[in-house]
């Protein structure tokens, strides 16, 4: 049994660390310490060391929880603390159990991590794509359930990753972005309302590109944040080519019609009414007719209508999760 030091206790790293601690016997290793640059002792029932304390330990490997910063952290540990490269590993090098599958990083993995936001609305309504979801996050790449479903639809239902064209992607998901950028036949532009998150700063209600410019526009879990819904959909309609497609999804409650309340103005009220502080509506079963009113032809792919129960469990997808494909 190998002695492991777990490095990195940020948001995702903290969830990974707790899962590893619970399951270390089954995974055939022993965690002797947790390490982070920040002092996090007050948040844990076990000791958290800083890198300078490593010389006091005897260990077999240091496991870095972050895929994004793995190379940077590895080089720093080697440079600053004299740790050999052979002793630094990633989670996928440590665990061989293959219970689940993540199509984002194309790996079979032993566990998924919980994620989501709690709100009283989730005890009253079943909101697909919202709330706390068990076994939702891949511990290797950090991708979540709705991103895995988006990747599946783009790849298996649309053959999207082999196509040519010009693509605008709002609020790009990291693993989806990586896959699209690898296709050199596509002109790919990412956009976000906040600077530093994408190639361009774009307001979906005032897109700066000319008419009929894009073959594809992707925007997942964006429209529920937009107050002027009509302006957003009119801009999507304006910017898409005649034979283009808009690929999008939103949190949705299939039990009710779309719910909006102008008296809901504070973050606390939005959390209670819609399930998240920055949401301005809760989409419902009338979504298809709303889309048609905006002038789109609307089709959708739903997990439970495409995959078997066994397949969706292996990929940890939400049965009712839905990707919409809009055309003119």
Residue spans for each PLM region:
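A short acidic, Gly/Pro-enriched loop at the edge of an enzyme's catalytic core
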Residues: 205-217
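A generic structural motif
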Residues: 24-31, 184-187, 296-297
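A short SAM/SAH-binding and catalytic strip from SAM-dependent methyltransferases
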Residues: 215-227
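S-adenosyl-L-methionine-dependent methyltransferase catalytic module, highlighting the catalytic core
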Residues: 97-100, 107, 227-235, 241, ...
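Residues that mark the start of a beta-strand
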Residues: 2-3, 164-169, 241
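A short helix->loop->beta-strand "cap" motif at the edges of active sites that frequently abuts
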Residues: 81-87, 165, 184-186, 244
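Hydrophobic, well-ordered beta-alpha structural blocks that scaffold small-molecule cofactor pockets
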Residues: 1-95
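Conserved N-terminal segment of class I S-adenosyl-L-methionine
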Residues: 93-208, 309-327
């Amino acid at each position: 049994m190998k002695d492991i030091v777990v490095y990195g206790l940020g948001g995702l790293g903290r969830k990974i660390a707790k899962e590893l601690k619970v399951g270390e016997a089954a995974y055939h290793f022993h965690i002797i310490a947790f390490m982070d640059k920040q002092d996090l002792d007050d948040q844990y029932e076990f000791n958290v060391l800083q890198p300078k304390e490593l010389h006091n330990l005897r260990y077999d490997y240091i496991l870095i929880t972050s895929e994004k910063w793995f190379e940077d952290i590895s080089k720093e540990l080697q440079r600053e603390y004299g740790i050999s490269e052979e002793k630094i590993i990633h989670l996928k090098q440590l665990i061989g159990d293959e219970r689940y599958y993540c199509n984002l990083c194309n790996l079979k993995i032993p566990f998924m991590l919980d994620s989501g936001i709690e709100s009283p609305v989730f005890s009253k309504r079943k909101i697909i794509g919202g709330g706390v979801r068990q076994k939702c996050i891949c511990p290797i790449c950090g991708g979540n359930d709705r991103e895995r479903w988006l990747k599946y639809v783009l790849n298996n239902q649309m053959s999207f990753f082999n196509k040519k064209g010009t693509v605008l992607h709002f609020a790009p998901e990291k693993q989806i972005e990586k896959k699209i950028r690898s296709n050199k036949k596509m002109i790919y532009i990412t956009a976000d309302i906040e600077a530093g998150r994408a190639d361009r700063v774009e307001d979906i209600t005032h897109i700066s590109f000319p008419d009929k410019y894009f073959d594809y526009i992707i925007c997942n879990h964006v429209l529920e944040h937009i107050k002027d819904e009509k302006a957003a959909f009119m801009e999507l309609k304006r910017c898409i080519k005649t034979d283009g497609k808009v690929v999008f999804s939103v949190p949705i409650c299939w039990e009710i019609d779309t719910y909006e309340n102008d008296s809901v103005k504070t973050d606390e009220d939005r959390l209670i009414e819609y399930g998240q502080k920055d949401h301005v509506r809760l989409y419902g079963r009338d979504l298809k007719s709303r889309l048609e009113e905006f002038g789109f032809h609307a089709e959708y792919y739903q997990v439970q209508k495409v995959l078997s129960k066994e397949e969706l469990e292996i990929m940890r997808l939400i049965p009712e999760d839905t990707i919409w494909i809009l055309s003119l």
